[in-house]
Every structure is written in C-alpha cells, then in structure tokens.
Amino acid sequence: MTLFKRAIAMTYRINEFEFALPDAELQDSSINILKFPTLDTTLIISRSFLADDETLHSNFDAQLKRLEQQVSNLRYQPVQRVRVGTKYEVEALELRSQFSKAADEVYQFQLALVLPSTRKMLALSYVKAQALGAAEAEHWSRIKLSLTFDGVQ
C-alpha cells in the first residue's frame, strides 16, 4: 500500500470559476483585461512582485524608463502620490500619460501600489486610443475609490 502525503491546496478564484492548486507556493503574475465599450476604454490589471532591493517608487521609475525606450512621443504629468480604496487605506503612485506605439496613439491613467505587508505590486492602466475626457476621468476615479483590499483594514 502506498501512502500519499496530501499537501494543503490553495484555492484560486477567477470570475468564472475557482480551482485548487496543489502547491501553495505560488506567485500570481496574472493579467486581467476589462473592456468598457460605452467609453471605448480598457482597464488592464497586472500583478508582479518587487525584488528585495526595490521599492514601489524605484520599480515605477524603472518601468517608466523602459516605456520611454519602447514608444515614441511619450508625454506625462508628474507622478502623484495618492491614497486609494474605499477607506483611502493604501498609498499608490498615479500617472497620466500619452504616447505613440507604431501607428497607434495611447492615452492612459496608471496606478501602481504594493499591497500592505507584502511585496506584491499591482499596476492598473486605464487606456484609450483617443484623449481621455471628463467621462473617462470620472470612471477612472470611481474605479480607484471602489478598490477593496483583502485583509487590509
């Protein structure tokens, strides 16, 4: 008779279903892409982990420098420190930018944050192929202020 040691599984949830992961050692680097047809905008949410020697600011600056190398006509407003969430409980960095990539114009709001007491970084990019107006700014603001963080008080 062979005995199998049963490891504690982690349940991973997405909108459509959840599933058990047999190994709890996991780094979620997934990306979600949500489209809003009425405003013709897209929200991209990406996850990553900061290296031991990185801060939110240093990572954000490095990503901005990489973006400068990959696109043309990059213009952006100064990076702002903001607080987000339903209780304004998480500090984040926000940037409004526009650039050209190939024949496409890209206009975006970007937000980066590190979940408290972790090294997990989340980046949200709210993107449109035309200039962002008041309706898009309001939509973006509502998204930022509605963030509810698991385990953050």
Report residues per predicted region:
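Acidic (Asp/Glu-rich) sequence patches and key acidic residues
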Residues: 2-3, 36-39, 81
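Glycine-rich, often proline-containing surface loops adjacent to acidic residues and nearby aromatics
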Residues: 39-44, 91-92, 119-125
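Secretory pathway targeting signatures of secreted, lumenal, and periplasmic proteins
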Residues: 9-62
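Surface-exposed amphipathic alpha-helical segments
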Residues: 2-9, 16-26, 123-153
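Short secondary-structure junctions
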Residues: 11, 20-29, 68-84, 149-150
